[in-house]
A protein has these predicted regions:
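The feature marks long extracellular or luminal low-complexity segments
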Residues: 1-430
Length: 430
């Protein structure tokens, strides 16, 4: 507060301060006063980061929109320091200028950009002093796109309940996951899917697809103008295998044990999807022969061949699980092997008056004994007897032969068809 002058009338005044700036120093004696200003400057030797404040946060991780912070540099006593070079670093892939220079007020703004969503730690340093603050970058919903669509479950049963599943992942243009995004979903080939799904915190969401139609269904996920498609496969339900159809495709085969009538059986599940590789049990009645089991082809059908040595109708039955269908096929006698199976005298000992007739019944069959209708049988009679030269068999394969004579005695009657012949004697009496 006081100083004392030296012999020469002067004295030195020393002034110190911890506050940078102008200090007015006033010397007073009696009523005489004078003042002079002195300046104290901040101490760059003790420059430190006094403060680091986030002033803008939550910017998009688009590499262009910035989060900002303000760093303040002072000396050890809090005096602001202009023109100081502050080193800056940012973590998590963020981009920042490596140094900034403080303004006259000792502050400098730091701009940070990133293409990576999440938290980035920004550190400002000078001398041995540093401070860090976290800023957050968010994924850019404006550039939302389908980054991936993966089938996670395939080959489910086409029963309208069992689902194939896919996982869709939504990111922004730089691959940052986006939660809460609405994805549109479509599925073709009759498959059913929720029309929209919403992504979870990890940017993914599961898509469930069901169908009653076996085969490939293309599932498409779309957001904005971005879409991806994947195929899933539904398989027919063997648990509900049934005989969907049994159709005669060839009928009227010859009953020779070799020529076959054929049918086509179709096996599907409860929703009409063709089932390959299914074992169908087959039976045929009326002595027809059939393979006891057949196996369906990729289209769910298989041909059934039926042979018989017995002319007539045979009911063919195809069965799987508790499902069965039957169809009739017809085998016809083989005219190529027509033969005289029997020649029997039905009336004998008629009067030889040229009017009263002896009669015989001829029966024509094929090689397996099936009666043949409509067959022409040649007839001859000996000892002057008279008979029609040909007769035609009835539906039961027989026909009556009438023989008259004016000559008493034995007449040999011969019936012939193809290379088959039979003879019987009849007696005419005077």
């Amino acid at each position: 507060p006081t100083v004392t002058t030296q012999p020469d009338g002067t004295v030195e005044i020393s002034v110190t301060s911890q506050t940078a700036g102008v200090s007015a120093v006033t010397a007073t004696i009696n009523s005489s006063t004078q003042s002079q200003n002195v300046t104290f400057i901040a101490d760059v030797r003790t420059a430190k980061i006094a403060d680091l404040v986030v002033i803008k946060d939550g910017s998009e991780a688009d590499g262009a929109t910035a989060n900002t912070l303000r760093a303040r540099v002072t000396d050890a006593f809090g005096n602001t320091l202009a023109g100081q070079t502050v080193s800056v670093m940012a973590g998590n892939g963020a981009t920042v200028a490596p140094t900034v220079i403080t303004e006259p007020d000792g502050t400098a703004e730091i701009s940070v950009t990133s293409q990576t969503a999440g938290v980035s730690a920004v550190t400002a340093s000078i001398n041995n002093s540093s401070q860090s603050r976290d800023v957050t970058f968010i994924a850019d919903v404006r550039t939302a796109k389908i980054a991936d669509l993966v089938v996670t479950r395939d080959n489910s049963v086409a029963d309208g309940a069992m689902a194939n599943t896919l996982r869709v992942r939504v990111t922004d243009a730089f691959g940052n996951t986006l939660a809460g995004q609405t994805v549109s979903v479509l599925a073709d080939n009759g498959a059913t899917v929720a029309p929209t799904v919403i992504t979870g915190q990890d940017g993914t969401v599961e898509i469930s697809v069901t169908s009653q139609t076996a085969g490939i269904s293309t599932v498409t996920a779309t957001i904005n103008n971005s879409s991806l498609s994947r195929n899933v496969t539904f398989v027919a339900d063997v648990r509900t295998a049934q005989i969907a159809d049994l159709v005669v495709i060839k009928d009227g085969a010859v009953a020779d044990g070799a020529m076959a009538n054929t049918l086509r059986v179709e096996v599907t599940d409860a929703f009409g999807n063709a089932l390959a590789g299914q074992t169908v049990s087959v039976t045929a009645d009326n002595s027809a022969t059939v393979t006891p089991t057949v196996t369906t082809q990729p289209d769910g059908t298989v041909e059934i061949s039926v042979t018989s040595q017995t002319a007539g109708i045979s009911a063919v039955t195809a069965s799987i699980n508790s499902s069965s269908q039957s169809r009739n096929v017809t085998f016809v006698a083989d005219v190529r092997t027509a033969q005289i199976a029997d020649l029997v005298v039905t009336q004998d000992d008629s009067v030889a008056d040229g009017a009263m007739a002896n009669t015989l019944r001829v029966r024509v069959t094929d090689a397996f004994g099936n009666v043949l209708a409509g067959q022409t049988v040649s007839v001859l009679a000996g000892n002057g007897a008279t008979t029609a030269p040909t007769v035609t068999t009835q539906p039961d394969g027989t026909v009556e032969i009438s023989v008259t004579s004016q000559t008493a005695g034995i007449s040999a009657v011969t019936a012939t068809i193809n290379n088959s012949t039979a003879s019987q004697n009849v007696m005419f009496i005077a």
